[in-house]
Regions:
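Alpha-amylase-like alpha-glycosidases and glucanotransferases acting on alpha-linked glucans and related
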Residues: 1-2, 11, 17, 55-196, ...
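Hydrophobic faces of well-ordered beta-strands that scaffold small-molecule active sites
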Residues: 6-10, 43-44, 213-215
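N-terminal catalytic cores of NTP/NDP-binding nucleotidyl/phosphoryl-transfer enzymes
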Residues: 7, 11-30
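Catalytic domains of carbohydrate-active enzymes, especially glycoside hydrolases
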Residues: 26-51
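Short amphipathic alpha-helices and their capping/turn segments at secondary-structure boundaries
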Residues: 29-37, 202-208, 277
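Conserved, mostly hydrophobic/aromatic
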Residues: 35, 45, 146, 206, ...
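Short, solvent-exposed turn/loop segments enriched in Gly/Ser/Thr/Pro and often Arg
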Residues: 44-54, 217-223
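Conserved, well-ordered alpha-helix/loop/beta-strand core segments that scaffold catalytic motifs
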Residues: 188, 192-221
Length: 277
């Protein structure tokens, strides 16, 4: 039987930070210490997946990849990958009560590119990265390729990419983009390494202090996602990977007209054939 316990719901993005959005940095560790001091047991957070248009963690480009907005620059500086001057004068937004997602989307990219460049130039760090790549190959390669190709087409949704062979994952098209976008693909891999390194270290710290993390995950994946791109047979889609039906909920106390989420419905018979793997 569980003992009676309490906790706090506080998503990472809501932590105080100088970078326009909460991160896995010192304020997160301070919050863990606060939970310990106030005799809490649980820290509840929202999904940590990468966000798409609308900046909702429930509409993600991937069911697995992490949100790189949460990568802390000070921690990268401690690794020798950045200098404070790389980000100290950057305007990440000046409203302490709200995140300017569009601003940080563009402001963070060149800083992360600098960190990735310095990381790849440091041979002493590559063994751990290679280990990360090997352990996450089931999703990491596809995600990095998806994001790089998506960026190549102006960040358009999967279904609107100009090259329909890329949408359909034609082998010759994929090989072409792997060569053309090799640098960008590597960028998306390394930033995922940064994310999971920082998140794992924070979670381990919390657990060692007796704080348990209550996570969350979306019910569905987004139509514009790597899963729809790589596993279309698992969803109810047309030949262009557009959803035939979309998820939502009927009217309730939160919405008099109901909600239409736009996520593709699962093809449950195909999931059953694959053992729900």
């Amino acid at each position: 039987m569980l003992t009676r316990s309490s906790g706090v719901l506080m998503h990472i993005t809501s932590l105080p930070n100088a970078f326009g959005i909460g991160s896995f940095g010192q304020s997160a560790y301070d919050f863990v210490d606060f939970l310990v001091e106030t005799k809490q047991t649980y820290w509840q957070i929202l999904p940590l997946t990468t966000t798409s248009y609308g900046d909702s963690p429930y509409q993600s480009f991937s069911a697995v990849a992490g949100n790189t907005h949460l990568i802390d620059f000070d921690l990268l500086t401690q690794m020798g990958l950045l200098k404070e001057s790389d980000y100290a004068s950057v305007n990440f937004g000046d409203d302490p009560t709200s995140v300017d997602y569009e601003r940080i989307f563009f402001a963070r990219r060149p800083i992360l590119e600098t960190a990735v460049k310095n990381f790849l130039a440091n041979q002493s760090l590559q063994d751990d990265f290679n280990h990360f790549e090997k352990n996450n190959r089931l999703w990491l390669d596809d995600f990095a390729e998806f994001m790089a190709i998506k960026e190549h087409f102006g960040n358009q949704a999967l279904q609107k990419w100009d090259d329909k062979k890329a949408v359909a994952r034609d082998p010759s098209a994929l090989e072409k983009y792997r060569i053309l976008l090799a640098e960008q693909i590597q960028y998306f891999k390394v930033t995922q390494y940064f994310f999971f390194k920082q998140w794992t270290e924070l979670k381990n710290y919390a657990n060692q202090k007796g704080i348990q993390i209550i996570g969350d995950m979306p019910i569905y994946v987004a139509a514009d996602s790597v899963e729809v791109w790589t596993k279309p047979e698992l969803f109810q889609l047309d030949k262009e990977r557009n959803p035939l039906f979309v998820a939502g909920v009927p009217a309730d106390q939160f919405s008099a007209t109901g909600q239409l989420w736009g996520n593709p419905l699962y093809a449950w018979e195909e999931h059953k054939k694959q053992g729900y793997a």
